Amino acid sequence: MLTEEEFLKKFGENIREFREERSMTIDELSIITGIRAQYLKRIELGTAKRLSVDHVFIFADAFNLKPHEIVKGL
């Protein structure tokens, strides 16, 4: 089982991977999701402390994925 720190780091890596696969910038993802670019950077770095299930659904919608695909490997 992952620690909270490991979970946040892996979640952030997944988000960065999905964003880069789509050649999106942080600013573009910010516009699509309504999440501030600065906070998106912290999510990708694994340093954001306030993630919720809502974030999974927001990112799934932004990347046109199913929610379980966002948390792959977690």
Task: Locate the predicted segments by residue.
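A short, Lys/Arg-rich alpha-helix, primarily the initiator
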Residues: 1-21
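Conserved hydrophobic/aromatic packing and binding residues within compact polymer-binding modules
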Residues: 15, 29, 40-43, 70
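Short alpha-helical "recognition helix" segments of helix-turn-helix
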Residues: 28-30, 59
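Recognition helix of helix-turn-helix/homeodomain-like DNA-binding domains
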Residues: 35-50
